[in-house]
Amino acid sequence: MTLIVTGAAGFIGANLVKALNERGETRIIAVDNLTRADKFKNLVDCEIDDYLDKTEFVERFARGDFGKVRAVFHEGACSDTMETDGRYMMDNNFRYSRAVLDACLAQGAQFLYASSAAIYGGSSRFVEEREVEAPLNVYGYSKFLFDQVIRRVMPGAKSQIAGFRYFNVYGPRESHKGRMASVAFHNFNQFRAEGKVKLFGEYSGYGPGEQTRDFVSVEDVAKVNLYFFDHPEKSGIFNLGTGRAQPFNDIAATVVNTLRALEGQPALTLAEQVEQGLVEYVPFPDALRGKYQCFTQADQTKLRAAGYDAPFLTVQEGVDRYVRWLFGQL
């Protein structure tokens, strides 16, 4: 049976295509918008059965052009949290997602989709409950609104619906994202270009570089998606993060030490990196005040209750692996 991945040339989508290939799955329809043409590079080492532009996909899927579809991994979205065009965001992230969902329900296909931790906004609790959901931007709202649709539809659905609230994802195949790429990606490039990594200074009660996030490797994101793909009886909305909040300082220190190790130099403590000017703190930008999550940490209770019991990579493990991969691409 056919599998469909939307956003297939994007960051998480391409990693899912690759992970499916590694399991022997090649009957995959890749759906994306290649207006940004350089994204094609993410699929060069992947095997797919067909490619469709997102503008023609939904109509063809809805009328059954692809025969029996087992599952749709819906990763396609505008993920730019600084996007201010609300009409574009809602059309792209909300209405388009509803159309894909409707087609899946009509055909009995598994629907596994990308939600986001941006739904929680400035909340200090990160559980999959309506009362703690308060997005700070229109991106978060587009994801929030779709999750509300899912909550209404899920009780009557005859096929799987699984949504994943991705926390701060990093890893291979994200270079096309530009400013929206992960902190690890930007730290890597900045250190190579300038010989130092810059982090935000003090803000909202957090010391320099001590704003904390739940940083999750795209390797783990793919594994969780595939777990639910293998268990179509399990539906729900699930946080997808490590369950650990780690400061940006941990990312920077790991990037610096991994690059030093690749050059045969010894590891340094964060304090030593700061003292030597390898990590530098800059004033927090006014444009982000009031719109910035200083703390995120996935509550994994629902995910673990659904049977996913594999450990998640720490920042030190995952970022080290990622930096070595980036270095190997040079």
UniProtKB/Swiss-Prot annotation:
Extent of the signal sequence: none
Active site as annotated: Y139, K177
Pathway, per record: Nucleotide-sugar biosynthesis; ADP-L-glycero-beta-D-manno-heptose biosynthesis; ADP-L-glycero-beta-D-manno-heptose from D-glycero-beta-D-manno-heptose 7-phosphate: step 4/4
Record's keyword annotation contains Isomerase: yes
Sorted UniProt keywords: Carbohydrate metabolism, Isomerase, NADP
InterPro entries: Epimerase_deHydtase, Heptose_epim, NAD(P)-bd_dom_sf
GO-annotated molecular function: ADP-glyceromanno-heptose 6-epimerase activity; NADP binding
Annotated substrate binding sites: N168, R179, H186, F200, G201, E202, Y203, R213, Y292
Binding residues for NADP(+): 11-12, 32-33, 39, 54, 75-79, 92, 143, 169, 177
EC category: isomerase
Reactions catalysed: ADP-D-glycero-beta-D-manno-heptose = ADP-L-glycero-beta-D-manno-heptose
Assembly notes: Homopentamer.
The protein, known as: ADP-L-glycero-D-manno-heptose-6-epimerase
Native source organism of the sequence: Burkholderia thailandensis (strain ATCC 700388 / DSM 13276 / CCUG 48851 / CIP 106301 / E264)
